[in-house]
Regions:
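Core Rossmann-like FAD-binding/catalytic domain of the broad FAD-dependent monooxygenase superfamily
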Residues: 1-290
Length: 290
């Protein structure tokens, strides 16, 4: 592979005490964040609770949750749906989720492959552009995720057979030492935004409110910004302001999702999958000049 561009983290050393990219899976982040949240004494994190349904009563919201001990009911002034792209909250409210789904399918193979030995000098996160077989490599603390773009004529069941997974790895990396495949996933990429981020005392944040091409981390980052914006509004309501300011949250974050996140991530998607030589050269030149 030929290096087109890399990111020098020294460029941000004066702006943050953490001038590096940390690729951390959700199950690890959750273990770190849970005690930090509970240490604030402002709330408790309940694991193993699945939302069944909810009712808004005008002054508060009640929700029924499925747990290992049966159904429990909880009550709060507001309900925030941070329950992902298949949001139960959004669906119960029949909030539209307009947008598109790309035709491409993607195959993620998680293994203990030592990619640093196969691609010496490569970064922990690599975007490898090739008109025939582009690949994303993500080195996490306990696993390496390699994402391939599937061909249009590929059968999904066939692609997921272990011998075919290994053949795909071999075709890209060449001869590899022994390794174990730990996980596989087939998925499609969506670009969608909810019709509204607020309905009464119910609000949407993160993937429940908007989906986008995950390349670049815009989904995670914009979801964190949703939460920060909404938290600031809740503090103001707690201090006596009218909850009409929740409309500001809904409008501000939805506008940002449409006008910034969706446009940027759609552009990045096309940058990854383009195959015309002239387009690829323009993209490569743009990346090299950045």
């Amino acid at each position: 592979p030929r290096l087109i561009a890399d990111f020098d983290y020294a460029c941000i050393a004066n702006d943050t005490p953490y001038p590096y990219r940390l690729q951390c899976p959700q199950h690890i982040a959750t273990c770190v964040l849970k005690p930090a949240v509970e240490a604030t004494m402002t709330g408790k994190v309940h694991m193993g609770h699945k939302l069944v349904d909810f009712v808004e009563h005008g002054t508060h919201v009640t929700a029924r949750l499925e747990t290992k001990n049966g159904i429990v009911e909880r009550q709060g002034a507001y309900l925030v749906g941070a329950d992902g792209s298949h949001s139960v909250v959004r669906r119960q409210l029949n909030i539209g989720f307009k947008g598109k789904t790309y035709e491409d399918r993607f195959l993620l193979i998680g293994s203990n492959l030592k990619t640093e030995d196969l691609l010496p000098g490569a970064a922990q996160v690599c975007y490898i552009f090739d008109p025939q077989e582009w690949v994303i490599i993500l080195n996490l603390p306990d696993i390496v995720r390699v994402v391939f773009r599937m061909r249009n004529d590929e059968d999904e069941e066939t692609a997921l057979k272990e011998e075919n997974l290994r053949a795909r790895i071999l075709n890209f990396f060449g001869k590899t030492p022994d390794y174990a495949i730990k996980t596989t996933q087939l998925y499609r990429v969506h670009q969608r935004v909810a019709d509204t981020f607020r309905m009464g005392r119910i609000l949407l944040v993160g993937d429940a409110a908007h989906n986008n091409n995950p390349s670049g981390g815009m989904g995670m980052n914009s979801g964190i910004h949703d939460a920060a914006n909404l938290a600031e509004k809740f503090v103001r309501i707690w201090n006596g302001e009218s909850d009409v300011i929740l409309d500001d949250y809904a409008n501000e974050r939805r506008q940002y999702a449409i006008e910034s996140v969706q446009l940027y991530t759609d552009e990045q998607y096309h940058n990854m999958v383009m195959s015309a030589e002239e387009e690829r050269q323009r993209r490569n030149n743009s990346l090299a000049d950045a």
